[in-house]
Every structure is written in structure tokens, then in C-alpha cells.
Amino acid sequence: MKWYKIFESAEAAAQQISANTVQTIWVAGKKICIAHTQEGFFAVNDKCPHNGASLGNGYCTKENSIVCPLHRYHFDLKTGRAKSGLGDVVDTYPIEVRADGMYVGFKILTFTLSFKRRE
């Protein structure tokens, strides 16, 4: 997991992203959506898996979902699963609050190539 600092503190994040709202930010070349709910902060991919709309233009609900502005699909902010049960899933990213700030984590993709030496 590679971690990127997105705010100086949880308080700074709360000042920039009001409760029950969402904001789109760029982190390490990825456009992600940060949602601030009663349960805390959550990070998801900004692109709706259903039709590609920006989830940053949507809104979050009291049920801890983010709602796509295009077709009103609801996605669970913890799991990324669509509430409709249609199988669409938005990528979620962990958020950690540390002494020096708030961080979002991205999985590191590694590829291993095996080559056998020909004799």
C-alpha cells in the first residue's frame, strides 16, 4: 500500500469538506472522491462504474452511500458495492488519520515476470 497525504489534519479536512458532502481531488494521477459523513471520511474512485459520471458531482446519504448524479445509483462508501444489487462496484481507498495528517492509500500493483534461461 502506498500512502499519500491529502490534508494536514482531520480538522483541516472537515473545514474543507463539510459534513454530508463530497469533494473531488487528484492524488498521484488519480481522480478520487472524498466523502465526509457522520461516520467519518471515505475515499472512492470518482468515476461511476455504471456509466462513468463523476461521483464528485453527486451527494452522500445518511445511510453512508454516495449517489451518482446521472442515474442516482447508490454505492456503499465502505464496500463500494451498489445498493441496487446490480453488481456494479466503485473502487474504495482506505483513509488513515495520523499525527502529521490525513492519508489515502492505494494498492501497489506489481507484476512479476519469470524467464527461464535457455541452455
How would you name each of these model-derived features?
Residues A53, Y73-H74:
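Flexible, glycine-rich terminal cap/loop adjacent to redox cofactors
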Residues Y59-S65, K83-V89:
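Short linker/helix segments within small regulatory modules
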Residues C48, C68-H71:
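Short cysteine clusters
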Residues M1-T61, Y93-K116:
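N-terminal pre-ligand scaffold of iron-sulfur
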